[in-house]
Amino acid sequence: MAHLRDRFWIWGHPEGRYNHEFGNEQESRMTPLEGALYMGARNLFMVPVGVNVNVRQYNKSFTPLKSVGWAIDNAAADPAALNQLIEQAKDYPNITCGVFDDFVGYLATHPIPPERFGGIGCVAR
């Protein structure tokens, strides 16, 4: 029987990424997995937000989760981002999707033509 919480997703960022930003005056060491477990979510979108992370190490920690998605904002500009996600999904079957997050900042002033996204959805595993 499906449960509603099986449909909830949490947006995860590297621990401490938003310390002292957006009115958050305290420091947080909570990892994305800890946040998901605390909130009772079984699915997580991981968005590093410009932080260079050890993708494999995070994926190891995400093994208790039902589904994991990673930000692939730059996949239309650089196919290597999508290829890395596909390679990681071979070792971690709970990686089920890629997420296009924000199109602000650099992408707001240097938009990617929509046709560049056409080939992304045709990759199947």
Indicate residue ranges for each PLM-predicted region:
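Glycan-processing catalytic domains of CAZymes
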Residues: M1-R125
